[in-house]
From Swiss-Prot:
It comes from Clostridium perfringens (strain ATCC 13124 / DSM 756 / JCM 1290 / NCIMB 6125 / NCTC 8237 / Type A). It comes from the Bacteria. Catalyzes the conversion of butyryl-CoA through butyryl phosphate to butyrate. Keywords: ATP-binding, Cytoplasm, Kinase, Nucleotide-binding, Transferase. It catalyses: butanoate + ATP = butanoyl phosphate + ADP. Signal peptide: none annotated. It holds the Pfam family Acetate_kinase. The lineage of its organism: Bacteria, Bacillati, Bacillota, Clostridia, Eubacteriales. GO terms for biological process: acetate metabolic process; butyrate metabolic process. One of its GO terms (cellular component) is cytoplasm. Belongs to the acetokinase family. This is Butyrate kinase. GO terms for molecular function: acetate kinase activity; ATP binding; butyrate kinase activity.
Length: 356
């Protein structure tokens, strides 16, 4: 049976929605919200009714009867660290999303919006593989400073979706393979997937790992300390250097990887150096994750928007092909990944996990 699903993926200035019948998309809309609209609300949670009304209005205009839905799926937010999987939205989750236990983020509305709409029609609401998925082994958490443990914050939804896609296409299960998955977008995350669990991954939000179009990745800690206490920068300014204005933005004043690729292809000296450093750091991180997996790697999977570039993927492959074969799934399809997570539960392939 093809289940009819509403998928909700809230961003800071837009809400992306999709309606699926099974894995077939029958509607996709990006509902843009102006700065004026968003600024009316003091907190992200205060936007709930406004966003819900916009979603229901668009569905009505497009002739979608919400009473025909089998479930509603939201993007998971900044919850407590949890293992990967599909979770049924419950009161404990809604409360934690309201307060944002790991910080405010538009995705916190995903679970709440899906729950609100599902309650109206007496159906179930789910979230799938939020950014806070944490399956790291204890040995990977130590950083050298007890007060600064390493944290698992990465592109869990897309990493898990492409890992499962690889397993399916190779007639095996995600729980039977060892993969290194590299998501390359505004941030870069490199995860070691061992038998269905991401046992180590760089904190792609504001932690360690390769630099990216907008993020600094791992930086020399002594110099960072000097910068923090130099009196020249506020806390917010230093954070911006790490997230938002780091990486390509800092070196080349662009957050578009295509600009760097073009400079490199044209032989521009500075552009080539930045591009080569980007490739170098990703390859180095892949090598590090190969060690985490004891050298037992079935494949290296590249994904995210930057993986559309053969120039990038070929450059990485040149450095890491001795580790394992490379597979490329360019881009990311978060709506489909959310739909697939719910379908696995509705079909009885997986059980819905309980958030506590």
């Amino acid at each position: 049976m093809a289940y009819k699903l509403l998928i909700i993926n809230p961003g800071s200035t837009s809400t992306k929605i999709g309606v699926y019948e099974g894995e077939k998309e029958i509607l996709e809309e990006t509902l843009r919200h102006s700065a004026e609209e968003i600024l009316k609300y003091d907190t992200i949670f205060d936007q709930l009714d406004f966003r819900k009304e916009v979603i229901l209005k668009v569905l009505k205009e497009k002739g979608i009867d919400i009473n025909e839905l089998d479930a509603v799926v939201g993007r998971g937010g900044m919850l407590k660290p949890i293992e990967g999987g599909t979770y049924e939205v419950n009161e404990a989750m809604v409360e934690d999303l309201k307060i944002g236990v790991q910080g405010p983020h538009a995705s916190n509305l995903g679970g709440i919006l899906s729950n609100e709409i599902a309650k109206e029609i007496g159906k179930r609401a789910f979230i799938v593989d939020p950014v806070v998925v944490d399956e790291m082994e204890d040995v990977a958490r130590l950083s050298g400073v007890p007060e600064l443990p390493r944290k698992s914050k990465f592109h869990a939804l897309n990493q898990k979706a492409v890992a499962k896609r690889y397993a399916k296409e190779h007639n095996t299960s995600y729980e039977d393979v060892n993969l290194i998955v590299v998501h390359m977008g505004g941030g870069v995350s490199v995860g070691a997937h061992r038998k269905g669990r991401v046992i180590d991954v760089n904190n792609a939000l504001d932690g360690d790992g390769p630099f990216s179009p907008e993020r600094a990745g791992g930086v020399p800690s002594g110099e960072l300390l000097e910068m923090c206490f130099s009196g020249k920068y506020s806390k917010e300014e230093v954070y911006k250097k790490l997230v938002g204005k780091g990486g390509f933005v800092a070196y080349a004043n662009t957050n578009d990887a295509r600009d760097l690729i073009k400079l490199s292809q044209e032989g521009d000296e500075k552009g080539s150096l930045i591009f080569n450093a980007f490739i170098y750091q990703i390859a180095k991180e892949i090598g590090s994750m190969a060690v985490v997996l004891d050298g037992e790697v079935d494949a290296i999977v590249l994904t995210g928007g930057i993986a559309y570039s053969d120039y990038v993927t070929n450059a990485i492959n040149k450095k890491v092909k001795w580790i394992a074969p490379m597979v490329v799934y360019g881009g990311e399809d978060e709506l489909l990944a959310l739909a697939q997570g719910a379908i696995r539960v509705l079909d009885g392939v997986e059980e819905a996990k309980i958030y506590k």
